[in-house]
Amino acid sequence: MTGPGAPPGGGALVPLVLPRRPRAAVLVLHGGRADGTGPARSWHLAALRMRPFHRAISAGLPHEDVLLARVRYRLRGWNGVRADPVRDTLEALRRLAELAGPVPTVLVGHSMGGRAALHAAGHPQVRAVVALAPWWPAGEPVRQVAGRHLVVLHGERDRITSPAESAACVRRARGTAARAAMALVGDGDHAMLRRSRFWHATTAAAVAHLLDPAGRPDPLPAQCYGAGTVPVL
């Protein structure tokens, strides 16, 4: 999937599609554990689960000018105040700036990756966060999403992370974000295996819309942006 001129592997940024002159970028962040100091591997299930998202996002983007990459974590866990995946995400953004310049970037994160994406949203390159079944404990900071777009999809039947806590975070973020939307995926689970095609297609369409709002339709209905009950799709 990687284009010509791609750098060798290693480091926090792993390019999957690398145009010669990117105008924008998408970084994908997989899930992990609350605590875990063992090394993160690309063959761990949390990382493997995001591969269909890589393919779906790539299929919906113009390869000639949008860079697609994943963030490589050093460790498997969040690890308390260390917030190791946030450090890795910020390092990936630093490397991205070296590679492509200060291009507008969308972060797509699942579970722990959604938490890392939220925390890294204040980076000057980040324009939007797409959080999938995010792990957002009560009281997560939202000041850093000021001026950014926030899209959240959470499985209606998720028993690992809390749709209610995601909804509470989105409500607080609406006071500072450019726009904030949330939808529940009907019958959806944390691993995003039930209705997997819907997860993949809706995520890819949301990313395409965030990068080209005038040219690509928003896959989410207007109710997702309102203050009422979170709609079920």
Task: Describe these PLM feature segments.
Residues E156-S162, A191:
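Acidic catalytic loop of the alpha/beta-hydrolase fold
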Residues V145-A146, V151-D158:
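Short beta-strand/loop motif that positions the catalytic acidic residue
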